Curated annotation (Swiss-Prot):
GO terms for biological process: L-histidine biosynthetic process. HAMAP family: HisB. One of its GO terms (molecular function) is imidazoleglycerol-phosphate dehydratase activity. This is Imidazoleglycerol-phosphate dehydratase. It comes from Thermoanaerobacter pseudethanolicus (strain ATCC 33223 / 39E). Pfam families: IGPD. The keyword Translocase does not apply. InterPro entries: IGPD_sf, ImidazoleglycerolP_deHydtase, ImidazoleglycerP_deHydtase_CS, Ribosomal_Su5_D2-typ_SF. NCBIfam families: PRK00951.2-1, PRK00951.2-2, PRK00951.2-4. It is found in: Cytoplasm. Its EC number is 4.2.1.19. Belongs to the imidazoleglycerol-phosphate dehydratase family. Pathway: Amino-acid biosynthesis; L-histidine biosynthesis; L-histidine from 5-phospho-alpha-D-ribose 1-diphosphate: step 6/9.
């Protein structure tokens, strides 16, 4: 089983993440940000990851530090749990619709951190969650996991639907890219490392 526990404490946040890549989609999420908890739950459920996230942050300021730092710690947990990445599929693209919204997420478990994000969101907030933090979370996650991540809105207008489709698609794409393919011998790269 590919598992990891990661803790990170700063003056702004105290984050704990427990991850099992080869899980069943069980989750226990408590960040103090209701909408973000919902999104992380969807991510775990649809990615079939067992995920526990406990976060305490300076929410009296805003949600930015907590959301970004969860992305950092979650990215570190995936990096640790993925291990040597032998025999993984490596690439995946997943489309997820939610009503009028259609989002495409493409991942390369490459060791080369990069984020391309084209998610125009009309609402400034969903609940107490600032929507600009979606991109901050994705960037922190991609850079700390060391993956290339492309996230694009193809259609849609409702910010809640767009964000929800994004987290579901990210979970599905990572599930596929991290799957073990017995046909792949060793590292899935001509360089010999990822």
């Amino acid at each position: 089983m590919r598992k990891a526990e990661v803790k990170r404490k700063t003056r702004e946040t105290d984050i704990y993440v427990e991850l099992n890549i080869d899980g069943k989609g069980n989750y226990d999420i408590a960040t103090g940000i209701g909408f973000f908890d919902h999104m992380l739950s969807l991510f775990a459920k649809h990615g079939l990851f067992d995920l526990k996230v406990v976060a305490k942050g300076d929410l009296e300021v805003d949600t930015h530090h907590t959301v970004e730092d969860v992305g950092i710690v979650l990215g570190n947990a995936f990096l640790k749990a993925a291990g040597d990445k032998k025999s993984i599929k490596r690439f995946s693209t997943f489309y997820v619709p939610m009503d009028e919204a259609l989002v495409r997420v493409s991942v390369d478990i490459s060791g080369r951190p990069f984020l391309y994000c084209d998610l125009p969101l009309k609402a400034e907030r969903v609940g107490n969650f600032e929507t600009e933090n979606v991109e901050e979370f994705l960037r922190a996650f991609a850079y700390n996991f060391g993956i290339t991540l492309h996230v694009e809105l193809l259609h849609g207008s409702n910010s809640h639907h767009i964000i929800e489709a994004t987290f579901k698609a990210l979970g599905r794409a990572l599930d596929e890219a991290l799957r073990i393919d017995e046909r792949v011998e060793g590292i899935p790269s001509t360089k010999g490392i990822l």
